[in-house]
Amino acid sequence: MSNANQKENVPSLGLPRTHGTLNVNALKATDILKHKGKLNEVNSDQSTTNENDEVQEEAVFLDDPVHFTRVSSSSELSAALSVNTTEQEQDEEKGTEHAELEPAEEDTVEVDTIRNNGDKTYSTIRESASDFETTNNTLIEISKNSSTYSSTEFLNNNNNGISNSNRATIDSESKLRMNKLREGSSTSLSNDSNGFNGMISSNQASTVLSTPSQKPSSTTNTITKANNGGSTRAQKEKHTSPKLPSTVTAPSSHRKSADLSKTNKLPSTTAKRTPKQAVTSSSPKEPAKRKSSTSKMKGMFSSLVQNMKRNSSDNRKSASSLSSVSSSSSSTLKISTPYNPKHIYHVGVDARTGEYTGLPEEWERLLASSGISRKEQQQNMQAVIDIVNFYQDVADHTGEEKVIKTFDPKKQNPLVRDSLSKYEQVDDNRTSYASGGTPTLEQNGFHTSSTPRSRTSLTSPTAGYSMISTPPMATQEKYIPTRPAPKPPGQQTPSSNASLTPKMQNATMSPIKENISSPVTKSEVDDELLLSKKNASLPKLPSDDSSSHKKSATDSAPTSVETDTETVKVPPIPKTTPTVPAKASRRSNEKKKEERERNKKLLYAKLTEICSPGDPKSKYRDLIKIGQGASGGVYIAHDTESEDSVAIKQMNLEKQPKKELILNEILVMRESKHSNIVNFIDSYLAKGDLWIVMEYMEGGSLTDVVTHCLLSEGQIGAVCRETLKGLQFLHSKGVLHRDIKSDNILLSLKGNIKLTDFGFCAQINENNLKRTTMVGTPYWMAPEVVSRKEYGPKVDIWSLGIMIIEMIEGEPPYLNETPLRALYLIATNGTPKLKEPEALSDTLTKFLDWCLKVDPSERATATELLDDPFITEIAEDNSSLSPLVKLARIKKLEEQEEDAGTDETEPETTPDTTI
């Protein structure tokens, strides 16, 4: 109740009061007039009764702070207990649980909980006595001994909404006094939680009390009783008002009393409570009531246990449902892309020992097997890292086919530019006419590739005629020496040169229809061979394997191939592939498929435009199959009008992985008419096969001449002059050849020299076959390519210098080294050393040095080399090469005859792998 109301209540009872504030919104009415009926017999003043009725009418509201008073004298208590019993019975009918606390001479003083805003806090002060006289004497004795009672402590409820106990604490002296009181059958002060819980169970109701969400900063209620004065002095300090209340609900009992039910329904109404409701006399019924309270308390605890069990079972059910949901959802979830990556490898150099630290095991094995010593690794750490990265890039290459590279699309005619522009967006990986990643050298109008590309000229086995690439070779075929090491002097080994026509003069011509219409039977075998190589493990250490091959049914003559592989194991490169959802993956695959179909239609439409109409069988006759690739065969034929020999390559477009490159190559070659380039003649599209007709060079490749003959400086000069003329033309057109070597230099019987991109030739032997199928050897590569630097057309000049060494010594430098070590030596040694440099003239030495300058800026161009004295003064005429070409052909025929005799005597046990 309010302070004003309390002031009015003080004179009504005639008792001195001290105010004490409990930190609650309200307390229910206490039994302040339990024995007023007995006091009324002593003092029957009606006015006192009326005033007490007014006190009951002015009950406390729920939102008001609760005040309580204590009595310091037994005389004052006896004056306060004079209330009529009949009025107590009338008040009992109205009674609810709201009133102020009056600790008079009472058997029991209870402070019960009141519902307010869904919060609850239980607090009680219970004083019990056996009878009225004992209570009066006890209170007087307590007053004399100045016993001090502490105010009630409030404890917050637990998570289940039930307070463990709210205890009324009593000082140690009071506890000793209470023990004495119990022994003398005096007033029993029950301050423990059992009495409190018993009181709650007797009420059988769920009550809610609003408690502050924050504890008051400071609250002190001190009640001091005077020993003899009979007056009570209270010292109270201000406390901060609590903030918004927190709501906790206590479980209600199954049995509820009518009075508390009314109170719960009307929490804000005031009601009067008569002393009859609050008074518990010392009567024979008291033990029965205590037993009832005990049983009710047990019922309350059993209800609490049931609620706890029910809550725990609900929690288990919810947890199981959550786990089932998570397990069902986890089956459909996809793993996200990696995050928070770790730096696993960090390569460094030990400052004390100078050795590498942190190298992956694969790299260490690769370097150990490559022949690169630790000393070399320590001396050129960056070079080793560069060549290993370069080697891995080439090994992981997906098979981009080698075509004549262009580095200035602006120099091409509009037809080429327009046709190529349609396909530039189709495949960003191709190199021809690709503008991305090729910085421009403005002074020359050239583009220099910012990313070195591997030598991936996928040549046909016939070392002479192809401007169209075959499908990519296996990874282990990329860095393989194109010829074995020279034979020791005096040592003779059985020749294993492959023979297309053991005796060319006796070779029978197959009908045109038979060669064209019949699908090449070795194509399927070669396709399987290529696939098995691609899917095979990483390259092994150098090894030599020889195998005999059976004759091909479609070839006009038996052929044999010796597979001489020299490979190095490449460390795997860890790659992270992000996981794509199934639907997104399907959509992406469908889009890619649609794009492929669209590009295929565009390609066929464009090929139909540029290809000549008609059937090639009607224009060319006497087709002789001289080679077989994975995508088709190579034939020699005669033009029905001019009777000139031509080379025809038949390609199945469905087997070509890079169809756009074929179109690009045709368009480039149509614009590259030159006397030193194997020229494109015509093309046909018949029944899904593309027929490319090219100029035929019957003398074969320069490799045959280099292998079987020794060249003079004049003859070397003639080869260099004709090669430089072809390079000058290509460079003027903005084309990078990037694969200048003896395999791609073709000769006629008269000694004429022409460049070809893929090294087709009329006759192939074991070396030719190896050099054409195992392409991309590093031995002719320029240092800037190996070191992953930008490069331009001068890479062809370096390759020309290596080819000069090849003509002088019969093989390129480092041919006997492993591919990785060869890359390392190219990157670190710079200009290779000749075995016998003193045998060369000064003119040739200077010319060679100019070609092999490590710095591309110091290296000569094709035009500058054509003006060098070695070309202008020493180089001989082309006719000087004719005897060498004929001599090489004779030696090849002899080797073929030996091979034919060996094939007749030995059983054929291995399948034909001739390409």
UniProtKB/Swiss-Prot annotation:
Q: Which UniProt keywords apply?
A: ATP-binding, Cytoplasm, Kinase, Nucleotide-binding, Nucleus, Pheromone response, Serine/threonine-protein kinase, Transferase
Name the reaction it catalyses: L-seryl-[protein] + ATP = O-phospho-L-seryl-[protein] + ADP + H(+); L-threonyl-[protein] + ATP = O-phospho-L-threonyl-[protein] + ADP + H(+)
Where does the CRIB domain lie? 335-348
| Catalytic residues as annotated in Swiss-Prot or TrEMBL | D739
Q: Name one GO biological process term.
A: fungal-type cell wall organization
From the Swiss-Prot or TrEMBL record, what is one GO molecular function term? ATP binding
Which residues are involved in binding ATP?
Answer: I626, G627, Q628, G629, A630, S631, G632, G633, V634, K649
Family note: Belongs to the protein kinase superfamily. STE Ser/Thr protein kinase family. STE20 subfamily.
Can you say what this protein is called?
Serine/threonine-protein kinase STE20
User: Which source organism?
Assistant: Candida glabrata (strain ATCC 2001 / BCRC 20586 / JCM 3761 / NBRC 0622 / NRRL Y-65 / CBS 138)
Q: Which gene encodes it?
A: STE20
